[in-house]
């Protein structure tokens, strides 16, 4: 047995390069960065001259290498000569000669970069140079040496046609060259008909809808009616009202507008009972005036689609890395439930093209949800109504994010900030529920905001029984905690018990409850299911580091996956990425960017064949090590330049102008530091 510091992954001595554990990247810090945030000056002394002290300088240098790269920007890489999209697909351009893109197909093909190809797994080996030279054309055209007629286009192979036409970097896979050198595009009509419903992404929002949203002309009558009710209720709450007791009559003026159910709840928490009328309103209509035409709380079970999630695996919604190609790969590996990346309600209502792209769904995603974040009913309820109207059959549930810890979201009153505002949260959930119709609403929360001040055990029974959420997921950490601290599964168990007790008291069917935090193996997963009362475990970081965890869970085993098998998963991701982001030059390099993002997590995986003890723990830090082959060592490299090299094994050489900036600064330094 090796002697390693506590909290260090127990790697067998023969694979160790150093006994010093490498720093775990701060996932919270990286998640909290945006392209508009600027780095603040660190370590300045108190003299006011802006000069750092020696001690502060040393601390700042250390922190600078451990923090997040703020303001990351990824420019779009385009062809030097840009062909008109309409002409590229054999159509007629509406702009004619005034089009700002070229219509000269022959000239474009002449200047176009050479075709790419995705090597087969059998072409790779586990020692350098690992794979074939992708700069070599397999079957060049007679008059077009830059076209490879032996390549296969992943888009054409899947759907029978390629929507990128002449712009496709794998054009030789769906083109023919005649004796005179003319190149024509071809399609597989039989395959197009066969896969029309199984390969095409769904949940597209058209330009007309985006325009309506931008101009604030999109009709949301359900949301408008609900918000008007809230306004009337708040106006009524601000009026002086007579409160009758057994001994006296007195005039009171409410200090702040709040929903009736929130007032009733606060009274109960203070040890007093709410007035009978308030109690009835609170339980049955959740703070909306009783005179309105409002469905009862039990509507969740009689009219909402029921969520049968027992025994199903759930891939957590993940910002940036939880894109459609990654979700598709996880589905192939065994994930049953998937959810899109978090979208902001304000951006949805502004008609943001980028935000609405987050709701796309691949047909292989069996149970799919859209996650929304916001800070008030006035944005979240209309967003829910738009989603319900645009995708009545394209979404299985909508998830309200009440767990996001990042500063940008929290300080705006969204995400985990809602955990400390039960009155507002109740209004949001009830309003979204009404706007969504039969589409279920789920809620993702944390144990609380501040460490030592958990409140999920109070909120969850209300979220389920009182506010009618159809499922709850609970991450076992507060907003204040960092990933270096373990999730509190004992508290998760306490929260589940509180919900089940409330449901039993009110004779309500149980809603699915999923816990989350630190699940990194099949053994972890089933231990949580068997001992903590949850219906399932939402898996986030565990899936980012080892997407095959879903296979392990389904097969109840720990998979000592080989480097070659991991390479196959990378190849799958590349094909899925090209289908989603595009097979033209821009799409190839967008796929490259997100592949590198995925590898920024997957390099952290320590092959279980190298460990002295199983199962591996997600928070154990790995010392520098070598794998069982050069390829396995490469896949474990913390150097972001090595991730780019891996991308080049499938996507060809990266353009000189293309640079990948990792989220974590420590990954931007040479791997020699990590090996020291």
From Swiss-Prot:
Residue ranges covered by zinc fingers (C3H1-type): 78-106, 152-177
GO-annotated biological processes: mRNA processing
Entry's Gene Ontology molecular function annotations: flavin adenine dinucleotide binding; mRNA dihydrouridine synthase activity; RNA binding; tRNA-dihydrouridine47 synthase activity; zinc ion binding
Compositional bias ranges of the Polar residues kind: 253-272
Ranges of Basic residues composition bias in the record: 56-72
Chief location of this protein within or outside the cell: cytoplasm
Matches recorded under Gene3D superfamilies: Aldolase class I, Zinc finger, CCCH-type
Top enzyme class: oxidoreductase
Keywords: Cytoplasm, Flavoprotein, FMN, Metal-binding, mRNA processing, NAD, NADP, Nucleus, Oxidoreductase, Repeat, tRNA processing, Zinc, Zinc-finger
Protein's UniProt name: tRNA-dihydrouridine(47) synthase [NAD(P)(+)]
Protein's organism: Coprinopsis cinerea (strain Okayama-7 / 130 / ATCC MYA-4618 / FGSC 9003) (Inky cap fungus)
UniProt lineage: Eukaryota, Fungi, Dikarya, Basidiomycota, Agaricomycotina
Gene: DUS3
């Amino acid at each position: 047995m090796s002697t390693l510091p506590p909290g260090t992954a127990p790697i067998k001595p023969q694979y160790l390069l150093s006994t010093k554990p490498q720093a775990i990247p701060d996932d919270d810090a990286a998640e909290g960065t945006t392209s508009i945030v600027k780095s603040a000056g660190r370590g300045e002394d108190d003299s006011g001259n802006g000069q750092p002290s020696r001690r502060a300088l040393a601390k700042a240098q250390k922190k600078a290498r451990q923090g997040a790269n703020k303001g990351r920007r990824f420019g779009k890489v385009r062809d030097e000569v840009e062909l008109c999209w309409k002409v590229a697909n054999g159509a007629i351009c509406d702009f004619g000669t005034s089009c700002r893109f070229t219509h000269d197909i022959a000239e474009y093909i002449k200047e176009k970069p050479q075709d790419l190809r995705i090597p087969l797994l059998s072409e790779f080996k586990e020692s350098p140079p690992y794979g074939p030279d992708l700069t070599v054309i397999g079957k060049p055209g007679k008059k077009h040496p830059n076209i490879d007629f032996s390549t296969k286009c992943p888009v054409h192979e899947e759907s029978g046609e390629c929507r990128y036409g002449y712009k496709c970097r794998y054009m030789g896979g769906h083109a023919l060259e005649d004796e005179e050198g003319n190149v024509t595009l071809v399609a597989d009509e039989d395959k197009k008909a066969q896969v029309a419903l199984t390969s095409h992404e769904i949940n597209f929002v058209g330009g007309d809808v985006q325009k309506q949203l931008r101009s604030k002309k999109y009709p949301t009558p359900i949301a408008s009616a609900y918000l008007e009710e809230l306004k009337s209720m708040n106006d009524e709450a601000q009026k002086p009202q007579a409160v009758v007791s057994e001994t006296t009559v007195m005039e009171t003026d409410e200090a702040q507008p709040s929903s009736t159910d929130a007032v009733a709840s606060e009274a109960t928490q203070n040890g007093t009972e709410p007035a009978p009328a308030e109690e009835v309103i609170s339980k049955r209509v959740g703070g909306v005036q009783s005179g309105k035409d409002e469905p009862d709380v039990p509507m969740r079970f009689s009219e909402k689609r029921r969520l049968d999630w027992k025994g199903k695996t759930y891939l957590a919604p993940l910002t940036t890395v939880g894109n459609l190609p990654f979700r598709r790969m996880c589905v192939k590996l065994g994930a049953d439930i998937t959810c899109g990346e978090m979208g902001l309600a304000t951006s949805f209502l502004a008609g943001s093209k980028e935000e609405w792209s987050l709701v796309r769904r691949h047909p292989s995603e069996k149970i799919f949800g859209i996650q929304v974040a916001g800070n008030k009913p006035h944005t979240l309820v209309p967003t829910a109504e738009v989603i319900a109207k645009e995708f009545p059959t394209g979404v299985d549930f909508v998830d309200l994010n009440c767990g996001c810890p990042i500063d940008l979201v929290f300080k705006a009153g969204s995400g985990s900030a809602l955990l400390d505002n039960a009155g507002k949260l109740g209004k949001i959930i009830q309003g979204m529920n009404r706007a969504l119709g039969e589409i279920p609403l789920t809620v993702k929360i944390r144990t609380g905001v501040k460490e030592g001040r958990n409140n999920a055990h109070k909120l969850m029974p209300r979220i389920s029984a009182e506010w009618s959420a159809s499922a709850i997921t609970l991450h076992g950490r507060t907003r204040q905690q960092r990933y270096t601290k373990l999730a509190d599964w004992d508290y998760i168990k306490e929260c589940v018990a509180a919900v089940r007790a409330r449901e039993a008291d009110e004779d309500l069917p149980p809603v699915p409850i999923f816990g989350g935090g630190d699940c990194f193996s099949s053994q972890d997963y089933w231990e949580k299911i068997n001992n903590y009362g949850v219906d399932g475990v939402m898996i986030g970081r565990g899936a980012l580091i080892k997407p095959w965890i879903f296979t392990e869970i389904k097969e109840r085993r720990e998979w000592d996956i080989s480097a070659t098998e991991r390479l196959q998963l990378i190849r799958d991701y590349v094909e899925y990425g090209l289908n989603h982001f595009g097979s033209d030059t821009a799409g190839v390099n967008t796929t490259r960017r997100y592949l590198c993002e995925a590898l920024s997590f997957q390099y952290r995986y320590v092959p279980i064949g190298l460990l002295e003890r199983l199962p591996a723990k997600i928070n154990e830090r790995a010392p520098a090590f070598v794998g069982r082959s050069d390829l396995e060592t490469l896949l474990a490299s913390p150097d972001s330049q090595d991730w780019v090299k891996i991308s080049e094994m499938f996507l060809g050489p990266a353009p000189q102008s293309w640079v990948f900036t990792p989220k974590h600064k420590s990954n931007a330094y040479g791997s020699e530091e990590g090996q020291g």
